[in-house]
Amino acid sequence: MKELFKRLSLILIAVSLSIQTYGQHRLSAGVRGGYPFSPQKELLNGINSLGRPLDVAAAVDVQYAYILPKTSYQGIGLSLLSLFDHEDVGTPLSLYVFQGARIARLSQSLSIDYEWNFGASFGWHRNKDYPFNTIMSTSVNAYVNGSIMLSWHSDDLNVSIGPDMTHYSNGHTEVPNAGLNMIGMRLTAARTIEGTKPLRYPGESWNEPDRSGGFSMDITAFGALKKGGIEYLDMFYVAEGKFTAAGIHINPFYDLHKHFRIGLSLDLNYDESANLSSHAVGNANGLTGFYPPPLKEQIAAGLSARAELVMPIFSVQFGIGHNVIYKGADLAGLYQIIALKTHVTKNLYLHTGYQFRNFRNPDHLLLGLGWRFNNI
């Protein structure tokens, strides 16, 4: 999680530098409430110090943003989460960057909007100190949130309500890492404040014109550390130490709109922890060790479909794919990717992402750099 925190710091610096160029600002406060769920169900089902299910979660948010042209905004926010079980889980505080924009205008004062948040959450109680907490093993965890909202606008006031989903986890850097999800509703009120500086666009020296119908290509290299698991005689063991995950994604895009791209990606991946179970050593009493798998069981080549929302400074990408060249059960099945690209220059970007398997199992972080080739 140290690498993720460093990456978040760089993203916050990029946002802070661009804030100085904007003339309109936005202050907001909101509440979120919903149903918490996790693949590891014991804590939420009532095996905790309270002796009752944890079936309600709530959060309060405060945000500062600068307003971009064309009804969009981005900035920095804080969120405080409660599962109403501070003893076992803690009351974590999240620091995040966010971006929102209009999807459709319904009338002069009503619209459908979206907003995403990405950051880090601090203050979780760790599993080794609080054994009832079977969902989190680190005090700092990633925070990802997305919302679709019905918004009412006046000259300087905005009120929004809509469905909301949140995910917390440590990127499989420690175990347990079941993570926590929350689905529910949010209510936000925002006020627009006029600034004193002239309005300019962030990175306006490199912003592209509308390239609808054009082609581009992103090449991303990434690496991260993760924990490995071993199944032996129907028991699950956590392998000692950490393992490397790395790769290169070669991703051509077709630009449907200057703010939306679709494409395919050739995903070349290396996972040092893959297929450890096939090389486990033990006896009737349990696991005693393992042999490192051969390289051919640790590398894979896959194809994935990608969709990307492109905004000033940031791009948010979603992908779903399947390995086509691989060996071993751990590299089979579908994988999913969600990633945030922070554009440093016209072509260079920071890549901060997360890969899942089969829509539910955390796999590893995708921390790296990428280069965009335009007009291919």
Name each model-derived stretch.
Residues 25-29, 72-76, 112-118, 159-161, ...:
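Transmembrane beta-strands of outer-membrane beta-barrel proteins
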Residues 23-66, 200-251, 372-376:
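Short glycine/proline- and aromatic-enriched beta-strand/turn motifs that initiate or cap beta-hairpins
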Residues 33-37, 80-84, 118-126, 154, ...:
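Transmembrane beta-strands of outer-membrane beta-barrel pores
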Residues 1-29, 110, 152, 157, ...:
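Bacterial Sec-dependent N-terminal signal peptides
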Residues 25-27, 37, 69, 107, ...:
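Repeated loop/turn-to-beta-strand initiation elements of outer-membrane beta-barrel proteins
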